[in-house]
Amino acid sequence: MEDEVASLVVDNGSGMCKAGFAGDDAPRAVFPSIVGRPRHQGVMVGMGQKDSYVGDEAQSKRGILTLKYPIEHGIVTNWDDMEKIWHHTFYNELRVAPEEHPVLLTEAPLNPKANREKMTQIMFETFNTPAMYVAIQAVLSLYASGRTTGIVMDSGDGVTHTVPIYEGYALPHAILRLDLAGRDLTDYLMKILTERGYSFTTTAEREIVRDIKEKLCYVALDFEQEMATASSSSSLEKSYELPDGQVITIGNERFRCPEALFQPSFLGMESSGIHETTYNSIMKCDVDIRKDLYANTVLSGGTTMYPGIADRMQKEITALAPSTMKIKIIAPPERKYSVWIGGSILASLSTFQQMWISKQEYDESGPSIVHRKCF
């Protein structure tokens, strides 16, 4: 591998795609992982209407489009749309020729094997990349926090997982996955706002609700007490202006929405909350390393950006763990992008250069090479 060629780092999230160059401290391009197609027939000739739009352009034209996310729960469900997103990433956002740069991609742990094989195939066959690698998202977040041991609770738009890592190795038997993340919280907020009399139904309106969620929601330290405060006074109410100028008021929904992370029963799910999942993940590890995991619990991903989430995690895990245990929740301010930052660090390490899967290796072995070289 030539040193002068910059590697590309692409973190394909269910909600946002983060892309840029290895060695940079932040992604150059961050755009929604959305492909939009017109809902109506184009009647004006020469408008340059396209049959599909990607990312921010799809977002800005959402009023006339049907929006689809090709990645659901961290798994690519629509490869044609995914290819459009990658094409957009390379040619429109980063403005690079993918055949000239090694590409580091990311994926959720416990993904189906076929998913990474197909990613590998598209990179080499459609985009002709000289080399590529697929890394596990949570491991990259830990790199970004400067640790080699810890448990990462990574929660994005599509999937949440807890990954214990010891001396740089992920412990696969103790990885737990929870299909409850940002998109489910957005849907839940749509539902509870509807109960308040505000109707949000279309894919375009869902994006408005996502914005409300990102701007106004927070995690309560004590849910019952917060509910009592909300019902007795209007101190927790906030207003939000919709695109048409209408102003809506939102009260206990602000903390009821993210509370579902701790009480998935709110969404009709039988799974454990993020605090219990983190605890269960630690308990699946060897008794000798648990202390190090409790003391290095790292939050990562956009769904961990709610104010109050770290304090609440601290409180909940302290209640579950042995009473003498030191518990430390690490919530770096840049955690929204820590997967990408970790990828940027990894791809620029000199020791990593022999880890790339080269085009030649791919031609010799086919897509299954990815399981041998990436773990």
Swiss-Prot record:
Taxonomic classification: Eukaryota, Metazoa, Chordata, Craniata, Vertebrata
Listed InterPro entries: Actin (IPR004000), Actin/actin-like_CS (IPR020902), Actin_CS (IPR004001), ATPase_NBD (IPR043129)
Record localization: Cytoplasm, Cytoskeleton; Nucleus
SMART domains in the cross-refs: ACTIN
Function of the molecule: Actin is a highly conserved protein that polymerizes to produce filaments that form cross-linked networks in the cytoplasm of cells. Actin exists in both monomeric (G-actin) and polymeric (F-actin) forms, both forms playing key functions, such as cell motility and contraction. In addition to their role in the cytoplasmic cytoskeleton, G- and F-actin also localize in the nucleus, and regulate gene transcription and motility and repair of damaged DNA.
Species of origin: Takifugu rubripes (Japanese pufferfish)
Name assigned to this protein: Actin, cytoplasmic 3
Tissue-specific expression: Predominantly expressed in gills, kidney and skin.
Catalytic activity entry: ATP + H2O = ADP + phosphate + H(+)
Gene: actbc
Disulphide-bridged cysteine pairs: none
